[in-house]
A protein has these predicted regions:
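Alpha-helical membrane-protein topology signature
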Residues: 1-92
């Protein structure tokens, strides 16, 4: 398969991966709910995404770099929102 075809598949996967976090971002920032969100799980996912980002940089994959950078930003926003909500409620 041509290089552009492989990168296109990566971009499509990246877009779907980004969109997948939308419902939780909405739950936290629009609905103001944090139930069911595990911060330790988000921390592990963030570490995995950073490693994928580094890998993408090393293999020069635009799709991996873009998708993981945007996803890390979205997850950071979710984590910040959850921490703010929990502090406002006085829960750990």
């Amino acid at each position: 398969m041509a290089s552009w075809g492989i990168e296109t598949i990566g971009l499509l996967a990246g877009v779907l991966g980004i969109v997948a976090w939308g419902p939780q971002l909405r739950q936290v920032w629009v609905e103001g709910r944090h139930d069911g969100i595990s911060l330790p799980t988000f921390a592990i996912v963030t570490v995995a995404l950073v490693l994928w980002l580094v890998y993408g940089l090393l293999v020069d994959s635009v799709a991996m770099v873009l998708a993981n950078t945007v996803t890390i930003a979205i997850i950071a926003a979710i984590i910040v929102g959850v921490v703010r909500l929990r502090r406002a409620e006085g829960s750990p």
